[in-house]
């Protein structure tokens, strides 16, 4: 009975997981079917754009070892997803803070979202085989675009841009999940210790 009560704590994280996955895939499929590769649409002037790009690799357009690396990366992602699932079950059993579980649900949703692209998109969209799909990215926030002064000792005269990486909903979910965990680390575990002490 106690175990069932603890696992109820995973209901909201599971809803968050499903919501992020659905939004991630809907946005990706829309971009994939309505934009041509490299197409860019300004949403908020030069600060926020939709820019359709694809990559074989990790979050924010980073790549890893070409096609052979793609298989390794996908296998690693699947192993990570299984580990996170097991960890969340264990954390819920230990009465982890709800926001802590939601944070891991965001990370899990992001990982699964990009795995779906990697495994299925190549075959579904007809450009490659299973496990060789490209991850669809679209959000581009070049918040700062400037030129480094000529009198600087390094990179003088070069263009500087922040934030350069193009990313997707899954990448954002992973990042938000990690940020919440890092910022709330002290609070999450202090709360758990207080609960254990009261028990």
Residues of each region from the PLM?
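Alpha-helical transmembrane bundles and membrane-interface segments of multipass inner-membrane proteins
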Residues: 1-199
């Amino acid at each position: 009975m106690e175990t069932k009560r603890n696992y109820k704590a995973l209901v909201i994280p599971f809803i968050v997981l499903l919501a992020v996955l659905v939004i991630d895939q809907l946005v990706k499929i829309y971009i994939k079917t309505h934009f041509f590769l490299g197409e860019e649409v300004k949403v908020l002037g030069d600060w926020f754009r939709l820019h359709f790009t694809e990559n074989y690799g990790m979050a924010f357009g980073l790549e890893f070892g070409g096609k052979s690396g793609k298989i390794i990366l996908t296998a690693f992602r699947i192993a990570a997803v299984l580990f996170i699932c097991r960890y969340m079950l264990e954390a819920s059993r230990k009465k982890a803070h709800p926001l802590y579980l939601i944070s891991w649900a965001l990370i899990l949703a992001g990982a699964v979202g990009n795995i779906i692209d990697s495994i299925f998109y190549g075959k579904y969209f007809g450009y490659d085989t299973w496990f060789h799909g490209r991850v669809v990215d679209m959000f581009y926030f070049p918040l700062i675009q400037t030129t480094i002064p000529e009198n600087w000792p390094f990179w003088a005269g070069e263009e500087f841009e922040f934030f350069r990486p193009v990313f997707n909903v899954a990448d954002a979910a992973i990042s938000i999940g990690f940020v919440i965990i890092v910022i709330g680390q002290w609070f999450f575990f202090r709360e758990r210790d207080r609960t254990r002490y009261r028990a």
